[in-house]
């Protein structure tokens, strides 16, 4: 009894620290993530018909990021006020969006990596690949992710707690589930939602890097390979920074909240580690627009409006040609 009381007190001592980390992280992410992803959607829509290079997947990735960003003000409110006055339905929906964003981001980062890899390694086979196929892949991915992520809110309960304080997000209690079933669900989720996508991204990175070692590369192909490797490496970097720590800490956090881990010191370390990992997982909404800017020439060109002077010159030349033609016609008629 005393040990349980001591551990509960230790967990409670971590609460203010964890709330502070969450509030600061989400505040930092909110404005840059919102502006960056809205700009990304505008840019991608503008040159969607000009390229076949994974633009559909990038659009879906930006949409996934916006889903999480739009819920951040409510998360910030909760972690600053330590209370949720907006009802259990909205709490569960925002909680659900977090996981939809995470696994949609993982899915579309994999799609972008595979698309660039295939387009580079098998250009003739995939050169005529239409964007509608990417659209079908995106729709199927959204359906699977949205259905699979329903497990996260279903495994939580939002019963009110004493003291007129309503819990939400990381404080939602876990329902009583058999340990064997819990381990099975976590294992399947980790393998399907994290390990397999990570292996695919690392494989694409490895094979693309090997292709640069060709002794007689054509300069144009070498440039394309370097661009593709840059894109795939950036996707792998975001994957490793944002999602690896979370998927290491998630099973441990689940065991803590299920009271399977009894050591007070271990509980304290795991709760802090999971809080940091959760913040890193949220950073992907802010980092994805950086991927677009530094790895996509069309994105930089349109965002910097470098194509604007060309358009102005084109319209000016057209106007001059039309004016000269009209002048010549009038002169001929007068003669």
Swiss-Prot record:
It is a multi-pass membrane protein. CDD domains: 7tmA_GPR174-like. SUPFAM superfamilies: Family A G protein-coupled receptor-like (SSF81321). The keyword Ligase does not apply. PROSITE patterns: G_PROTEIN_RECEP_F1_2. Keywords: Cell membrane, Disulfide bond, G-protein coupled receptor, Glycoprotein, Membrane, Receptor, Transducer, Transmembrane, Transmembrane helix. It holds the Pfam family 7tm_1. One of its GO terms (cellular component) is centriolar satellite. Disruption phenotype: GPR174 deficiency appears to favor regulatory T-cells cell accumulation in specific tissues. Knock-out mice are resistant to inflammatory shock induced by lipopolysaccharide (LPS) and cecal ligation and puncture (CLP). GPR174-deficient B-cells have a defect in CD86 up-regulation. Signal peptide: none annotated. Interacts with GNA13. Interacts with CCL21. G-protein-coupled receptor of lysophosphatidylserine (LysoPS) that plays different roles in immune response. Plays a negative role in regulatory T-cell accumulation and homeostasis. Under inflammatory conditions where LysoPS production increases, contributes to the down-regulation of regulatory T-cell activity to favor effector response. Mediates the suppression of IL-2 production in activated T-lymphocytes leading to inhibition of growth, proliferation and differentiation of T-cells. Belongs to the G-protein coupled receptor 1 family. This is Probable G-protein coupled receptor 174.
């Amino acid at each position: 009894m005393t040990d349980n009381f001591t551990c509960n007190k230790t967990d409670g001592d971590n609460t203010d620290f964890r709330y502070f980390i969450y509030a600061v992280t989400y505040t930092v992410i909110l404005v840059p993530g919102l502006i960056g992803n809205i700009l990304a959607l505008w840019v991608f829509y503008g040159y969607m018909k000009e390229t076949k290079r994974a633009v559909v997947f990038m659009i879906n990735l930006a949409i996934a990021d916006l889903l999480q960003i739009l819920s951040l003000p409510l998360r910030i409110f909760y972690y600053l006020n330590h209370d949720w006055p907006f009802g259990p339905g909205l709490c569960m929906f925002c909680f659900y969006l977090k996981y939809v964003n995470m696994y949609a981001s993982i899915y579309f980062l994999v799609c972008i990596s595979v698309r660039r890899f295939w387009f580079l390694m098998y250009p003739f086979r995939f050169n005529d690949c239409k964007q509608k196929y990417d659209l079908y892949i995106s729709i199927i991915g959204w359906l699977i992710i949205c259905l699979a992520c329903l497990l996260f809110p279903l495994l939580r309960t939002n019963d009110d707690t004493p003291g007129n304080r309503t819990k939400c997000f990381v404080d939602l209690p876990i329902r009583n589930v058999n340990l064997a079933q819990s381990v099975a669900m976590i294992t399947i989720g980790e393998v399907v939602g994290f390990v397999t996508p990570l292996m695919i991204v690392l494989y694409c990175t490895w094979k693309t890097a090997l292709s640069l070692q060709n002794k007689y590369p054509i300069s144009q192909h070498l440039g394309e390979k370097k661009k593709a490797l840059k894109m795939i490496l950036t996707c792998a970097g975001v994957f490793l920074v944002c999602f690896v720590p979370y998927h290491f800490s998630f099973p441990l956090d689940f065991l803590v909240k299920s009271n399977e881990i009894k050591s007070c010191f271990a509980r304290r370390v795991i709760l802090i580690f999971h809080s940091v990992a959760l913040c890193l997982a949220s950073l992907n909404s802010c980092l994805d627009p950086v991927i677009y800017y530094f790895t996509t020439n069309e994105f930089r060109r349109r965002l910097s409006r470098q194509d604007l002077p060309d358009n102005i010159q084109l319209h000016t030349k057209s106007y001059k040609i039309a004016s000269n033609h009209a002048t010549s016609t009038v002169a001929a008629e007068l003669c």
